[in-house]
C-alpha cells in the first residue's frame, strides 16, 4: 500500500512576492498552472482569498474520471502565504500551502502538502485501481514541479517592475 505524508517543491521567480501571491491566491486561475485541476470556482459568495472561504475544485489525473472537492482557505496573507485544506471521502485530509519569501531579484515560492488525516485503505485501492496511480507521491511531486514552473513562466512574462496588485477580495 502507498503512503503519503508530506512533500514540498520550491522555485525562484523574478517577480515581487505580492504579485506572485495574486496569481496563486486567485484559485480561478489554478487550471492555468496545475496539471490536475480542470476548474476552480469560489463558493458561498466568496470572490477571492480569505480565511474560511470555500471553493470547488474539479480534479483529473491522466487516467480515470474527474472528481470534485471543496477546499477551505486556511491562510491568506498577501505576499507571504496562501493555504487551503481539503477533505475527501476515503482520501483523508490534506493541507496545501504556498509560502512566498522575498529573495534576491524576486520571490522564492514553495508549494507543499501535508497529510493531516491519512488516506484510508479503500481510498488507496480506488487511487490505485480506478485512477491507475501506482506512485501517488511521485505524481504529486511532478505536478508540483509543473505547477511552479507554470507560475514562474506566467509571473515573469506578465508582471512588470512596479506592478501594483489588486486588493484582495473577501468572503461575502
Model-predicted regions and their roles:
Residues 1-51, 147, 166-172:
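Hydrophobic ligand-binding cavity/cleft-lining segments
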Residues 17, 47-49, 74-80, 99-108, ...:
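A short, structured loop/turn motif at beta-sheet edges
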Residues 49, 62-65, 90-92, 147:
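Short glycine/serine/proline-enriched coil/turn segments at secondary-structure junctions
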Residues 61-67, 117-122:
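Short, cysteine-centered beta-strand-loop-beta hairpins and adjacent loop/turn segments enriched
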Residues 86-142, 151-153:
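Beta-strand/loop substructures that line and gate deep hydrophobic ligand-binding cavities in soluble
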Residues 148-166:
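Charged phosphate-binding loop/patch that engages nucleotide di/tri-phosphates or the phosphate backbone
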